[in-house]
Amino acid sequence: MLQHIQAGHPVSVVVTLVDGLVVARSVFHHSMNYRSVVLFGRGRLIEPEGEKLEALEILTEHILRGRWRDARKPNRQELDATSVVAINIESASAKVRTGPPVDDEEDYQLPTWAGVIPLRQQALEPVADPRLRSGIPVPGYAARYDRTR
């Protein structure tokens, strides 16, 4: 894949979030409620060490704000073993499915439950590494982590 990107070939990135299982009266009409996006463009490897470190910091801080300043920064060996790709987005496509099942008209009379089982991704209480030295508290950014920001 990295050779493909380095050669300047087009790339795509797909992200899908499943919001619910749609349970119809007929197995044929079972589905999922979801949000999906496909990005199309051309990628490039981020190679200069300073730019790569900056990209890793931005990514780390996006995932867990405050972590970059607390964690050990990547050493030379780790940086050399890590590839970072930037994608110049040329176009995008999104698709969303929401709502209840859509059954065949005659199936609405069946004595079979139908509906949606909502799903969500949820951050739970942090669990300390079993090898964590004693006396190191859970940092605020981990204790108060919220994926809805």
Regions inferred by a protein language model and the residue ranges of each:
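Short, structured beta-strand-loop surface elements
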Residues: M1-I58
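C-terminal edge-of-domain segments
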Residues: E47, E51-R149
